[in-house]
A protein has these predicted regions:
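Conserved donor-binding/catalytic core segment of Leloir-type glycosyltransferases
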Residues: 5-7, 162-181, 186-192, 204-207
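Short hydrophobic beta-strand element within catalytic cores of glycosyltransferases
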Residues: 251, 270, 274-277, 287
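Donor nucleotide-sugar binding/catalytic pocket of nucleotide-sugar-dependent glycosyltransferases
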Residues: 120-158
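A short, well-ordered alpha-helix in the C-terminal region of glycosyltransferases
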Residues: 310, 317-331
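Glycosyltransferase donor-sugar binding loop
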Residues: 44, 203-216
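Conserved acidic donor-binding segment of nucleotide-sugar-dependent glycosyltransferases
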Residues: 289-290, 294-301, 310-316
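Acidic donor-binding loop of glycosyltransferase active sites
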Residues: 245-259, 273
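Nucleotide-activated donor-binding/catalytic signature segment of Leloir-type glycosyltransferases, i.e.
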Residues: 216-236
């Protein structure tokens, strides 16, 4: 019998770079590294409601053949997989785990209270931040565990850090390209600060896969881009730090309602790049002012432009955070961050 089975959005055969797919693959890869390639089975939840009969069979296979069964659904999938896991577990008595992707669970439970009773029966629920855990504890959960988001990246060494020292300073966004991630605020802010200062102080590169619901709008936006704004496309995970290391700052003015511990923050820290982020959801737990970047309260394009103008007056102070950002990334290595899950799979509970 295998040690672990993972049911998640692998998107097998498809080139998907969204947060759910990336985290599902990252966690599974680390399980294989720590437990052994042959000790981990997978079931792909990609396909939506039409694929549910197939998914039910695949999950049953995991319960039959694995000591620990893990689910990693998005919010719609949670309504299907939580009851399914508990139904199968009446017969197989496995250790069942739920790894939360993003920061939407507490809000979702407010309108789906029937799920609370079900999720309390899981052996552990792994959330991405202390704030998320506290919210679940307020609802009476005693099985919530913090497992920070993590990525397997080619982190820089300290002597590989780059310190941009002249205008124009390179800025970037590095997330799914959609309005709710603050893409338009970033564009407007860079336009504003360059216009107000009368020169090209900043350039902006927009990296990431364009959300399918935003493709038409973004296509129109690109037609209006000045020379100092360009679209860089999607970047492979193993190239993120190499791509980011020369950038002066990463902009993350998100207001995406499902935001958790965003992987883009780990990408930035691993490249030694400080972040300018909105005070949204859980960003303030991970973007530490004076250490890894700056947080903007009630962020909008005007406030972002003001912060950028202030930073341009003292770029040396901004660059002084690059080393501390790189060191902070060590907390989110797969080896360290995955320990709560690995310990429980190996029977070392510490709730």
């Amino acid at each position: 019998m295998k040690k672990a089975g993972v049911c998640g959005h692998f998107g097998i055969g498809r080139n998907l770079l969204n947060g759910q797919t990336v985290k599902t693959k990252t966690v599974t890869e680390e399980l294989k590294n720590r437990l052994g390639e042959t000790q981990v089975a997978v079931a792909d939840s990609c396909g939506g409601f039409k694929a549910m009969p197939r998914m039910a069979v695949d999950v049953l296979r995991l319960f039959k053949g694995c000591k620990n069964v893990i689910m990693m659904p998005a919010n719609r999938g949670l309504r299907f997989f939580a009851p399914l896991f508990l139904t199968y577990n009446k017969f197989y008595r496995r250790r069942i785990h739920y790894i939360v992707i993003g920061g939407w669970l507490d809000t979702f439970l407010e309108s789906h209270k029937w799920l609370v009773r079900l999720l309390k029966k899981f052996d552990a629920i792994y959330v991405e931040s202390e704030t998320m855990k506290a919210a679940l504890c307020e609802r009476g959960f005693n099985n919530a565990v913090v497992m920070h988001n993590f990525k397997k990246l080619n982190s820089l060494s300290e002597n590989e850090l780059e310190y941009p020292d002249g205008e124009p300073y390179k800025l970037c966004t590095f997330s799914r390209v959609m309005k709710e991630k603050g893409i338009e605020d970033a564009i407007d802010a860079v336009k504003t600060v360059n216009s107000c200062l009368g020169r090209t102080v900043y350039t902006l590169d927009i990296f990431g896969q364009v959300d399918k619901d935003y493709e038409e709008r973004f296509s129109e936006l690109k037609k209006t881009f000045p020379d100092f704004i360009r679209c860089g496309g999607a970047i492979a995970a193993d190239r993120s730090t190499e791509t980011l290391k020369s950038y002066f700052a990463l902009l993350f003015p998100t207001y995406y309602r499902g935001e958790g511990f965003a992987g883009t923050l780990i990408d930035a820290m691993s490249a030694g790049v400080p972040v300018i982020a909105s005070d949204w959801k859980y960003n303030s737990e991970f973007v530490v002012p004076g250490k890894t970047g700056v947080i903007i309260e009630n962020c909008n394009s005007e406030k972002l432009a003001k912060v950028l103008a202030d930073i341009a007056d003292n770029p040396e102070k901004w660059n002084s955070m690059r080393l501390s950002a790189l060191r902070e990334a060590e907390k989110y290595s797969p080896e360290k961050a995955s320990r709560p899950l690995i310990d429980r799979i190996n029977g070392r509970d510490c709730l």
